[in-house]
Amino acid sequence: MSTLYEKLGGTTAVDLAVDKFYERVLQDDRIKHFFADVDMAKQRAHQKAFLTYAFGGTDKYDGRYMREAHKELVENHGLNGEHFDAVAEDLLATLKEMGVPEDLIAEVAAVAGAPAHKRDVLNQ
């Protein structure tokens, strides 16, 4: 059985999606301010590694846990559910723009928007 990672097109597709996703995020007035002082090359690399893991491309993830990675943003910069939803919307819009089939976009939405994932990111 293929993983979501494989169905999306593997490394090449995830890398392209992340690059296009951040182009969109950095234009999104709802969330772009969270990335003002971020090393975007490093951020892209982290996101590529995370999505590879989240979509079943590997069982190893060396990045920080979601709670730890976003704690400062929640506590000091007001990261909230609306921001989380905006990020998810931008990811799904990017995939749609890339021509990813709706059934795969729905699978990505189930992973990206999972309630447990949202709670972890928002430290709830």
Curated annotation (Swiss-Prot):
One of its GO terms (biological process) is cell redox homeostasis. Keywords: Heme, Iron, Metal-binding, Oxygen transport, Transport. Changing residue 46 to A: Changes iron coordination. Heme binds at residues 46, 70, 117. It holds the Pfam family Bac_globin. One of its GO terms (cellular component) is cytoplasm. Changing residue 117 to A: Increases heme dissociation from the Fe(2+) hexacoordinate complex. It comes from the Bacteria. The keyword Metal-binding applies. Its cofactor is heme. GO terms for molecular function: heme binding; metal ion binding; oxygen binding; oxygen carrier activity; thioredoxin peroxidase activity. Binds 1 heme group per subunit. The keyword Iron applies. Belongs to the truncated hemoglobin family. Group I subfamily. Monomer. Forms a very stable complex with oxygen. The oxygen dissociation rate is 0.011 sec(-1). This is Group 1 truncated hemoglobin GlbN. The gene is glbN.
